[in-house]
Amino acid sequence: MSNIVVSPHSLSTLAGIEILRNGGNAIDSAIATNIVQGVVAPETCGIGGDLFALIWINGENKPYCLDSSGYAGSNVDLSSLSSYTNIPLDHPMSVTVPGAVRGWYAMHERFGRLEMKDLFSQAIEICSKGFKVSSELHQSLKTVSYTHLRAHETDY
């Protein structure tokens, strides 16, 4: 059987390939790829985001759908939002509790083959050795800089 791993960043793709070479399945590879993508391109995904997956297991003739989207925090006060027709993207109430990590573990529990700790190995190595920051990540970090965050500190 042939496999293919595709992601927006070469290091993420290589992590997924390495998992397959080490006996992991497509789910293990997808999780490891997503974990590394969150390291090398956190502006695209990562532990602070959500996860949605449509999984097809060969021979089962049915899809599995995972919605691991975030939910509102327990202290949300909807009355404080009544003056808004839309919640501004930079408002604290626009943020949810992240669901990505919960999604990784849910997928792994049901479909994974390797140990979960093995799926983090490439990300840990990349964090330890460092990596070249892409122009996209540089721009994203520049846009959401300390100065921008300070401008909204009274909103919190």
Model regions: which residues?
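A short, hydrophobic C-terminal helix/tail in secreted or cell-surface proteins
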Residues: 151-156
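Noncatalytic scaffold domains of N-terminal-nucleophile
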Residues: 1-14, 18, 26-150
